[in-house]
Amino acid sequence: SLGVRKVIFIPDKYLAQNIAKETDIEIITWDNGSCEVHELFTPEDLIEARDSVDNLKIIAHPECPPNVISEADFSGSTAKMIEWVSENKPDKVMMVTECSMSDNISAENPDVEFIRPCNLCPHMKKITLPKILDNLLYLNNEVKIDPVIAKKAFHAVDRMIKLDIS
């Protein structure tokens, strides 16, 4: 527990809604924020997949809409989905998230058949190892924040970093 009754949660409205369902915390969110990949999934997609694939387990990223999460067998962060597959070793699994995630996890779980509903993220595809190296070497995309804004934000950011959620 965070020891608070109300939290401002941005930028993803679906993640905020899913967290609100799991906690007793009032969550204030920004209605325009969502992941374009995760919001493309519908409950009907999951129902259709389950009807057409025997013994299918469905795991969904919590940035999916709540009605999609309610059709899944498990919902968790990317790390939690990886952990779930490794621990449960389902015969067949559909990961309701960006499709390259299944590609990454399938290499470590060759006995699991991955059903891939493929929604590609155009933004994630822009990230490449050469671009990361270039940015680390030359700091090409440095973000500069107005000192007045930085000072106002410092205490909130510092509290988030120090927060013990274990």
Tell me the role of every PLM-derived stretch.
Residues 1-166:
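The feature marks the mature, well-folded catalytic cores of soluble enzymes
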